[in-house]
């Protein structure tokens, strides 16, 4: 071996150059470095220009929820094992190659089980809704090819274990040969770890299958269906296929016996390993001693590290360690070492449960009871595994809160250090080692937190023990910490990737430095023993492998080489432990992405989603912790990688995942968004109505909820959707404010202020509703008004100038209005013929009202008082300057009041004024109908360019000899346009028509009592003015006790009714002769002067007499308004 090395060192002498160096290589290197630097600068500028072109700033911080890509830094081996294991020692090459190949196959089988078999078996039975008859059988039918693959996979595991045992039996035996001599003092612990991994896989499969009760139940139903079809093939149209059905049934029974009954691992360890005449296993004492030695050593290392703070991924191997021990007992039937079993039992009590795959848990006590029942007698007859688990659960519950708090502080410190780019000084070597330590610390933290989370959930589920609400919050806090760690690794992935090569180099240097201690012991020697020669070859191979990338294949071979090196006994136990530690670190650094993802996985939350509403309720009561919601949602979607592998349903991604996502979104909406929207709305209302002196809440008793914390959250990423709480609350408030504002239009200002407050307090930009202030396109229908015109005129007031009717009073806080647009829309609905019908109804109404009008004036008491006033005015006309005296008006009002007052406090004069107002409202409605008709006609004909030159479409169609139907349609069009044109240009003089129809009768000699009407007009006008002043005063004071009649600010129906009646009676000249408005003007001026003179005489200041003067001015102003309305109304009835 040594000679071969010297030969290798001198075999390339012909390629050796002389030592002369002219500096040209340095110049070339600097030139290339300059070009590379310029390329990097140019590339950065191009990227910056692309970013500016996209008009979008790229996020400087990586986010695991939104980043479309991530850095994948796992190395892959390009060389075969044969090329890696290449030395001049042929026996060494052969043995190392065989066992490294076995270890590599074990690793591949383990990865295959984790990626292909675990998830489909775990999620089988998860349904997307209500299942119907036959769905279970269909699901099993889809699973059948998968189960056949699983059977082949299990058989491959069996054969691999047989191969390992056969290899062991060949090298560990009493008969001496070159192999036994080589492995005399070598303990291949790396191979035993591979066996542990295989046993873990088989035990995990047993646990997953047996704990999924839906799988066994569905398989039984499918088997019964096959038997039924086989017994009645004609019924199911499968006659002639009996052989296939028999084969299918046999296959189902075979798969059930092999896979579904929990004997996968047991069948493995009970298979035959002896090959008579070739390999002896059970009688091989050397193999038994070697096996026993390795089992004890491995268990010793496992027992000391399990539950330790530096533990990492040991619990996942616990089933494999137990499987290795059970395999040893089954293989060699050795149950004599009771002390060792007690050590195993102590570990079992310390770790009574292990999470092996998401929601599947493994219990070592059950494993021992099933496969080693005779060993339980060693620990006594009082064995009660359920009580052990309850005690363990009590301890976990007791320590849970404190451990979560401790982990929270540790994670916070670790995240700060990982995010920090500063170092504590020292060399680059020290900094890199520090980064390695930080990475491993993060993985260890996530591992322990994940174990705590799964242990709490698993024990409570298995023992059906209730969880405290506070513990539920702590459970989700564990998930938040796991996602925080994973997110930190993701954010720092660029830094980690940049340092991985240096980290690997440093770790390999440390390993080589340790191995140099062994190498130095053999330096300078010319003769070596066989064992020493094997150690030197192993050292050389280790050095060669560590010079390359740290792939799984290289690390496997290095571990086998280290097992060979350890036999030299040169390294101390501490050095060996450090070597193992650095090899483990090297493995972690090389595959950090997969390890972090596995240790931070929160898929178990899918099977604990019933706890999610409790967590959301706690979060809503503590808004300061709202930022943790995104981490929890990230944890909840970890199960996607599991559900996506479901085989029993078609398109699992669109069915299982969508059902789960919708369920979670519904919980968030129910427990966060809906109550948040209502509480924000309530808070805004309390702020806006603070002037009402609402009783304030005591913050020390009720607490203060900072709802803004939820609204400050960035949009939450959940699966492929985004939950924007701020946007949803804005939409809720927009919708609520709009709907409520629509019902109560008078509250528009309140809701406008609430929108402003929502912006200033919560940053919510709400939409303006753009509701009309008080006018809608649709009001009371003209047909309904026509049928109930007697009610309409009494409940609505008319405004002459705006040509609008306003409701007197309403049960709500809004008043309905009717304008030209409403009437126009009604006419468009019913047709223009409704206008004439409306006039007919108005005529009948006027006939009834004029009958009452005539009766009032025919009354002897009224008639005598009017005659008296007319006589007095005629006799004293000159003394009164032709102006009707106001004293007579006051006297007439007093006399009529003496005739009686109604229950509502109205006199006969008030009733008479109301009668005239109703008549005027009817006339105003007729005017409104006419205006609405013209509005309708103008809108209908507005697309005709010239009404004076309208072509005849009938002539045009006839000229071109179009079809009769077209000619008929053009005739109809001509008729419609002609009618609309006439209606628009001519219109109908309804007022003139109604004057003519009543004038003759009113001026008849039989109605002589009506000729004195004009003399009561001043009294009616004064009564109207008093009524308007009183109503406006009460409206201004916002009195809540006023009656419906007083709630008005306009009532021009009285003016138009008065003008109409004066025209009917032809008494306009008679009324003008009274010069009543001049009298009122003179009276007001005289009263003001008199009051000022009296005030001056008495020395009263002007401001003390202000109210009296103001009253006179209001009276004068109201009379002027009435005068203008009355004068405008008289214009309608001029000839």
Swiss-Prot record:
InterPro entries referenced in this protein's UniProt entry, alphabetically: WASH-4_N, WASH-7_C, WASH-7_central, WASH7
Keyword Ligase: no
Cellular component terms (Gene Ontology): endosome; phagolysosome membrane; WASH complex
One Gene Ontology term from the biological process aspect of the record: endosomal transport
Keyword field: Acetylation
N-acetylalanine: modified positions: 2
Top-level taxon in the UniProt lineage: Eukaryota
Pfam families per the UniProt record, alphabetical: WASH-4_N (PF14745), WASH-7_C (PF14746), WASH-7_mid (PF14744)
Subunit structure: Probable component of the WASH complex.
Family, as annotated: Belongs to the SWIP family.
UniProt name for this protein: WASH complex subunit 4
Lineage: Eukaryota, Amoebozoa, Evosea, Eumycetozoa, Dictyostelia
